[in-house]
């Protein structure tokens, strides 16, 4: 085998999975693009805890364990991503304390898109809910 790159790609030499999660510092082009967008335009994703965003949303030194619990603050530091979906509300309605916990992790102008609970959106009772 002469080209070792594919074999090398099998081994993750990244940081320990438990390393703290930190935001990836945005480059100048990303900051400039965000500054040119209208403030009324909001971009975001359906979640903040996608592991493949290391080096894009999370710093290259970030671990991946705990993204669901600790990744929201880092996600909200990206100048383009000023909103995110709260999918878990579909499965079980979140409490006021949950919403307050999320809100405390982001800037004041950050927004959430909350998925309605399945009891509201489903026209039938699911087998797993009987």
Positions of PLM-derived features:
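Residues lining hydrophobic/aromatic ligand-binding pockets adjacent to catalytic sites
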Residues: 1-130
């Amino acid at each position: 085998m002469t080209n070792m790159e594919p074999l090398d790609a099998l081994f993750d030499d990244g940081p320990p999975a438990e390393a703290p999660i930190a935001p990836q510092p945005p480059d100048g082009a990303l900051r400039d693009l965000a500054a040119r967008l209208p403030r009324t335009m909001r971009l975001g994703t359906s979640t903040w805890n996608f592991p493949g965003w290391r080096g894009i949303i999370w710093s290259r030194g970030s671990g991946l364990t705990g993204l669901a619990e600790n990744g929201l603050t880092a996600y909200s530091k990206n100048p383009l991503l000023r909103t995110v979906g709260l999918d878990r509300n579909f499965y079980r309605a979140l409490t006021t304390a949950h919403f307050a916990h999320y809100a405390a992790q982001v800037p004041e102008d950050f927004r959430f898109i909350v998925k309605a609970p399945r009891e509201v959106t489903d026209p039938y009772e699911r087998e797993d809910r009987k």
